[in-house]
Amino acid sequence: MGRMTATPARRVLLAAPRGYCAGVDRAVIAVEKALEQYGAPIYVRHEIVHNKYVVQTLEKKGAIFVDVTAEVPEGSIVMFSAHGVAPTVHAEAAERKLATIDATCPLVTKVHKEAVRYAKDDYDILLIGHEGHEEVIGTSGEAPDHIQLVDGPEDVANVEVRDESKVVWLSQTTLSVDETMETVDALKSKFPNLLSPPSDDICYATQNRQIAVKKLAEDAELVIVVGSKNSSNSIRMVEVALDAGAPAAHLVDFASEIDEAWLEGVTTVGLTSGASVPDVLVDGVLEWLGERGYADVETVKTADESITFSLPKELRRDLRAEAAALSAE
């Protein structure tokens, strides 16, 4: 009689932190509160956050997502997404007599303010980011004559500045930390006097989620990142997992997108989610994996997050006014 070989226990390593960051949480709640406060429709310029499920859920509640301000009927309410907008967009909204609610993430606003400040001092600003991303378009719009985009280390050779003693780098908030520093190092080799921003532009949540996914990659044969294909921070997490040694890593919006073939020979699955992803989607993946024998779930914690941001000021003002009116009755 042959000896029985024990099957290795299948398990899931669940990253913590994962999912919603403070800026996304604030933006999503802002749309929900605006719908409650003013009624549908609430127009939102671009997807409020880059997640298919979140956008579809808010559409069902009465949010209408538009690509350009001209699509918003005059006199309506328009909310700007968490990614931020250029000053020209604020001007367009004023021209159309739109009531605006600015749900730009405060960490993106910080980069906007840095751009304005350095442009005022006549610096050449090298903005590290991905061409066409809404956040990059918004930041570039703050100082179009001073900002040039650097889309990775391979772009550095083409960068030219007016005065090498007055150059500063800024970055999109959702990039790979490692790749950004590689770009910065290349820029510093070319421009030794390159100035750095006063504090990191890459946001705390992006950094924390990348650190967590690196930890998963140490032990998992497969890493699944829940997130949308247009989510910069989610895409970066797949890249970071592969760079950190994970044999395979994939991005999915929903559990139904997972290919059973990915699990072949896999005993340990690493699971995390992008900063725009509600936990209900991660729960769906856990359930799907559980049905296939990956019932043992172990949380891998690499950081605590307690940051919260207050709602956009326009919304806070109206909510306060309503509360005051109710208490006066």
From Swiss-Prot:
Its EC number is 1.17.7.4. InterPro entries: LytB/IspH (IPR003451). Disulfide bonds: none annotated. Transmembrane segments: none annotated. Dimethylallyl diphosphate binds at H50, H83, H133, S231, S232, N233, S276. It comes from the Bacteria. Keywords: 4Fe-4S, Iron, Iron-sulfur, Isoprene biosynthesis, Metal-binding, Oxidoreductase. [4Fe-4S] cluster binds at C21, C105, C203. Isopentenyl diphosphate binds at H50, H83, H133, S231, S232, N233, S276. It is an enzyme of class 1 (oxidoreductase). It holds the Pfam family LYTB. GO terms for molecular function: 4 iron, 4 sulfur cluster binding; 4-hydroxy-3-methylbut-2-enyl diphosphate reductase activity; metal ion binding. The keyword Oxidoreductase applies. The active site is at E135. Catalyzes the conversion of 1-hydroxy-2-methyl-2-(E)-butenyl 4-diphosphate (HMBPP) into a mixture of isopentenyl diphosphate (IPP) and dimethylallyl diphosphate (DMAPP). Acts in the terminal step of the DOXP/MEP pathway for isoprenoid precursor biosynthesis. Belongs to the IspH family. This is 4-hydroxy-3-methylbut-2-enyl diphosphate reductase. The gene is ispH.
